Amino acid sequence: MQYTLSILVENQAGVLSKISGLFSRRGFNIDSLAVGVTQDPSVSRITIVANGDEYIVEQLEKQLNKLIPVIKVKRLNEGEFI
C-alpha cells in the first residue's frame, strides 16, 4: 500500500540525511520526496511517499518521532494533500 508522510522538522543541516537514513536502515524505499520551507523559516516540511505494509509504516512513524530535529509526523490520507 502507498503511504504519504508529512514531517515537520527543524530547518538545519543534516536533517534530511537522518530521515532518509532511517528509511534506508529499515529497507524502506522512498518513491517520492519533497522538501520545502514553511511560513516559519526555522521549520521545513518533508513529504515522503513510500510503499509498505501498515506495521512498517507505524514503526517508521514512531522512529521518526524520536529523532531530535523532528517536530511532528503526520500520515496523510487521500484528499489531505495536493
Which role does the model predict for each range below?
Residues 1-82:
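A conserved regulatory-domain signal marking ACT and ACT-like small-molecule sensing domains
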